Amino acid sequence: MVLNLVLKLTLFLVLEITLKNTMIYTIGGIKGGSGKTTIATNLAIWLAQKGADVLLVDADEQETATDFSAWREQNVGDEIGYTSIKLTGESVRIQVNKLKTKYEHIVIDTGGRDTTSQRAALVISDYYLVPFNPRSFDIWTVYKVQNLVGEIRAVKSEPLHVYTFLNRADPRGADNDEAAEILMQCEGMNYVPSPLGNRKAFSHAAGKGLGIVELNPPDEKASIELNNLFTYIFSNSTN
């Protein structure tokens, strides 16, 4: 009941968003292991379920998003809900610019390093979503991300909206609060107060080639967390 209400409210918010211009999102960061591909694939599926034309670009040399899409096709059939392509280096900027008129949303999954692919993606992106695990080694990289954002904004004519959030958050303990405090203090980056918990549902869904919102029976807590995260970003993107 609660989950259905959340999904309906989310759908309403998304339908309220003006789709006259293609929205481009880069899911990235400086450190690997923060769950970027999980976020990217779930965002692509989440948007596609709202009826949007979505392009998922795998700009990570590990090609995990490409592997997921291939596995998804085997499990759910030819119609996976979005278009998936692989691009690296400057081709990310060049090809996405050529393709953007064909899609309402483009989601770019980049690796956990400061690469040419990630910078090429950021130059053409409207939004930069950066997940952080609430661990010291992960949080320490936020200042490198901040520097990267500053460099991109210095050469980018259009605004780059940056959202940071906690992924794989602990169910309890001080680590979440301490990490959130650091992220909130970073100028030029918006902290999203909707963490994703460290839940088995994400790997369970990926193993079936599904997004969290497609699990049946659903994982209510994971679905609500994901919807809260994306809804927060979308509702603020219209401001």
Model-assigned labels for residue ranges:
Residues S203-N227:
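Inter-lobe coupling/hinge region of RecA-like P-loop helicase motors
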Residues M1-T26:
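Extreme N-terminal, non-catalytic leader segments
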Residues S117-S136:
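Inter-motif core of Ras-like GTPase G domains
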Residues D170, A180-I212:
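Beta-strand-loop-alpha "switch" segments that mediate conformational coupling across diverse proteins
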Residues I39:
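Hydrophobic positions on the alpha1 helix immediately C-terminal to the Walker A/P-loop
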Residues Y143-K156:
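Conserved C-terminal guanine-recognition region of P-loop GTPase G domains, centered on the G4
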Residues I24, G28-I30, S34, I45-T116, ...:
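P-loop/Walker-type NTP enzyme "switch/lid" segment
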